[in-house]
């Protein structure tokens, strides 16, 4: 929509009250959503919007640096959970690594243990290797594949099994 513009459409402020009527009327009450890489950026925006629409949210973020290196910090996921709770919605933090099968299973298990089910999965976790293709080493390339590709698989597989049991599920892959 040219009148609203790209930035206004995608970056409009999230209301500070959960359950506020969405412009399009889409409600997600009683749905449970997992968002990977939700400690900042688009993942944070997805988590906040899902909560605003009534979903219970698992906020997954390893807490590492943008390039995937560095020691993990629980604070990004915890900060988003605090924002969601301040809205009056429900959320729980998860700090597991999407790039391992155990991490993927633990993320989904967090949703099941906390909220009893999984209905929505947004695979958003990613790392940034700020290098041109010719300057990227095989190790850099593998790190990107481990998080972006394998991470999506490791979380989707157990989430899809849970969704099949529920008879409902939606999966979004971001790139």
Language-model features, listed with the residues they occupy:
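Canonical Rossmann dinucleotide-binding motif of NAD(H)/NADP(H)-dependent dehydrogenases/reductases
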Residues: 29-58
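Conserved glycine-rich Rossmann-like NAD(P)H-binding loop of the short-chain dehydrogenase/reductase
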Residues: 55-79
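The beta1-alpha1 cofactor-binding region of Rossmann-like NAD(H)/NADP(H)-dependent oxidoreductases
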Residues: 74, 78, 95-106, 138
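Substrate-binding pocket helix/loop in short-chain dehydrogenase/reductase
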Residues: 84, 132-133, 140-142
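A glycine-rich helix->loop->beta "capping" turn
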Residues: 87-90, 110-123, 129-132, 168
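A hydrophobic alpha-helix adjacent to the NAD(P)-binding/active-site core of NAD(P)-dependent oxidoreductases
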Residues: 128, 136, 144
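A short, exposed helix-loop element centered on a Lys and neighboring polar residues
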Residues: 156-157
